[in-house]
Amino acid sequence: MGFDLYTIDFETYYDKEYSLSRMSTEAYVQDDRFEIIMVSCKKNDEPTQWFWSYEEEDYKTWLMERGIHRGAVLAHNMMFDGLILDRLGIPMPPMLLDTLCMAQATLKPHHRSISLDSCLKHCDSPIRKKGYVHNMLGRNLRSLTTQELHDYADYCVTDTDGTHWLFHYLKQRLPKSEYEIIDTTLRMYLEPAFDLDP
């Protein structure tokens, strides 16, 4: 691809009424209740790092210091993570990748669920998602103890490592031309535009 690969995962506040299962991704990210609890980021094959802050601007600074805006950025559901990058004011990276899209093409015809957890199990990954997110219903960042924050970070980092592993597993099953299609599809969602005739 010619770019450094950045794999990311955001963890955000949710509750029984305010969640991605009850509203559109756009409505969720634009809602006044939206809060980033943490983000994890893996550059190429380097160890995954995580970061938290009470201020959204700090997330932008942390991610851009790592050069995320100059690389290929990967997530499992980039429509969600990409909207957060846009909310933070991070320039859209030159390449967008999504293991959810890759799984849609390679696993969905034979496998009912393409959640990250299901994909990792189906592909016999040594990485397994952890269930700590279920303990976070209705919990915002300020409510977390130091131990809870670190437990959640372990979950977040595992998601990023799992996404990175899944990408390398699935890329053997997709032609390289599909990356451009995935990137274009994501940009039509994240950077919608009208082309008007002169």
Residue positions per predicted region:
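Short secondary-structure boundary/capping segments within folded domains
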Residues: 27-33, 41, 63-66
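Active-site-proximal helix-loop-helix substrate-binding element of RNase H-like nuclease domains
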Residues: 34-37, 41, 45-60, 71-171, ...
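Flexible, charged surface loops at secondary-structure boundaries
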Residues: 1-2, 64-70
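Entry/capping segment at the start of metal-dependent catalytic domains
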Residues: 1-34
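A short linear-motif detector with a strong N-terminal bias
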Residues: 15-21, 30, 52-54, 64-65, ...
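Common nucleic-acid-contacting/processivity interface regions adjacent to the catalytic cores
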Residues: 16-19, 176-198
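The start of beta-strands in P-loop NTPase/AAA+ ATPase cores
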Residues: 4-6, 71-72, 93, 192
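Surface-exposed beta-strand edges and their flanking turn/coil or helix-capping segments
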Residues: 20-22, 64-66, 111-112, 168-170, ...
